[in-house]
C-alpha cells in the first residue's frame, strides 16, 4: 500500500522545536523580512546566518516525536510511505523514514548564495557541527547560505511533491 503523509510545524513542535507562527513563535522575536527573504540576506547575512545557526543547534538537541516514529514504523512494516513535509528539520529521517521530500528546504544543508538550487552547490553540514560563518564559501566561491526556501523564492520541490 502507498501512503502519502503531509506534515508541518505541529509535528516538530511535539519534539520541542520552536515554530514560526505560534503565539510564542520565532516571528514574534524576528521580523520575517529580516531572516527569511533574499532581501534580508542581502541586507544582513550575519543576522540570517546567526538565526539559522541557532535553529540548527536547537535541532541537534531535539529527538523525533511519537508522530515521526509512527510514520517511520509504517515504512518498516512494508508500506511505501512518502513523506512530504513543510518542515526544514530532519526528524523524519532520524526516526527512520527514507522517502522524505522537504518542500521548504533542509536546515542541516547549505548552498550557494548565487545558485541556491544548483545540486552541485548543496552540501550537508558535518554531524555535530551546525554553525556556518561569514566567510564559509560554497564551491562556486559565494557565501554559504541556508538551503531554505525563503519567502519570495520558488519552491523547487513542488513538482516532485505533486507527482
Identify what each model region corresponds to:
Residues 1-163:
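Conserved catalytic core of sirtuin-type NAD+-dependent deacylases
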Amino acid at each position: 500500500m502507498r501512503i502519502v503523509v503531509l506534515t508541518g510545524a505541529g509535528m516538530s513542535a511535539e519534539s520541542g522545536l520552536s515554530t514560526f507562527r505560534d503565539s510564542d513563535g520565532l516571528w514574534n522575536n524576528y521580523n520575517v523580512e529580516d531572516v527569511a527573504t533574499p532581501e534580508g540576506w542581502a541586507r544582513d547575512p550575519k543576522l540570517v546566518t546567526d538565526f539559522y545557526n541557532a535553529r540548527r543547534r536547537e535541532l541537534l538537541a531535539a529527538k523525533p516525536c511519537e508522530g515521526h516514529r509512527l510514520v517511520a514504523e509504517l515504512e518498516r512494516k512494508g508500506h511505501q510511505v512518502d513523506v512530504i513535509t513543510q518542515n526544514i528539520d530532519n526528524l523524519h529521517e532520524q526516526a527512520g523514514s527514507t522517502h522524505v521530500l522537504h518542500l521548504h528546504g533542509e536546515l542541516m544543508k547549505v548552498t550557494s548564495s548565487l545558485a541556491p538550487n544548483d545540486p552541485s552547490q548543496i552540501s550537508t553540514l558535518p554531524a555535530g557541527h551546525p554553525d556556518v560563518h561569514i566567510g564559509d564559501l560554497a564551491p562556486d566561491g559565494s557565501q554559504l547560505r541556508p538551503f531554505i526556501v525563503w519567502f519570495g523564492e520558488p519552491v523547487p520541490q513542488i513538482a516532485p511533491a505533486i507527482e
